[in-house]
Amino acid sequence: MVGRDAGAGVRLSVNVNKVATLRNSRGGAVPGVVAAVDTCIAAGAPGITVHPRADQRHITPGDVRDIAARLAPLRDSVEFNIEGDPRADLIDLVLEVRPHQCTLVPVQPGEITSQAGWSADTSSERLVAVIRRLQLERIRVSLFVDPQEAPIRWAKHVGADRVELYTEPYARDFAAGGATRSAAFSAYAAAAELAHSLGMGINAGHDLDLDNLPLFRTLPHLDEVSIGHALISRALFTGLDRAVRDYLDVLI
């Protein structure tokens, strides 16, 4: 499978959830999530992602509002992406702050992080209504899916503008190397080609890092990657500014 032209840039959206996780582990306001957003933007990040979960384990509604206010003057240059399950309070918050993009993600009880994309047999009536409501407010809608034909076609059926390919399986198979690595990339490339042929954009995220990203960024038609855990972990040793720049060096 032929990859993307290495000269074409892919947007980086920095997920700042882990900054809020660290803050909440102690209480108080340190480290500041908005300060982290400022540092990411100063380093050149063209996107910021948050995933405000119902239990508020990291990002809170207040964080979302504060980040939205900080990014408002930069709307033409820095995209804001809010991830989450389509629960009523989250959709109301998204409609309030009007990010560029809302990535709808299925949530399993007790999960630490997202573990799978939407199933193609998910009841779609309510989801279709949510997607249309967001799009009427000019909010792009992306659906978190596995790199398989059925969920990608389902995403198109329910009206998504983009899909976000769940990349944990790619990261695992990349680490295995050899034919396993090649087969994994080919499967994701085929998924991207299908989504593109259906008129949807392609995002990706989960366990992407500086080791596996150079290959993955050549994925055909890839628009954006959302990276949080690996980037924030690297920042502990290099500083946040340097960590963001290291990822941008791979993507641009």
Annotate each predicted stretch with a short phrase.
Residues 57-88, 122-142, 180-204, 210, ...:
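Alpha-helix-loop-beta-strand connector modules within alpha/beta enzyme cores
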Residues 10-16, 48-50, 78-84, 102-104, ...:
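Hydrophobic faces of well-ordered beta-strands that scaffold small-molecule active sites
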Residues 109, 140-194, 198:
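Histidine/lysine/aspartate-rich catalytic loop segments that bind and position anionic ligands
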Residues 87-97, 148-158, 204, 208-222:
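Catalytic cores of alpha/beta
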Residues 44-46, 71-73, 96-102, 136, ...:
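Glycine-enriched alpha-helix->loop->beta-strand junction motifs that scaffold or abut catalytic
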Residues 1-85, 95-99, 154, 180-183:
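Conserved N-terminal beta1-alpha1 strand-loop-helix module at the mouth
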Residues 176-181, 234-252:
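C-terminal helical cap(s) of enzyme catalytic domains, especially alpha/beta-barrels
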Residues 46, 103-111, 162-175, 221-240:
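Glycine-rich phosphate-binding active-site loops on the catalytic face of alpha/beta enzymes
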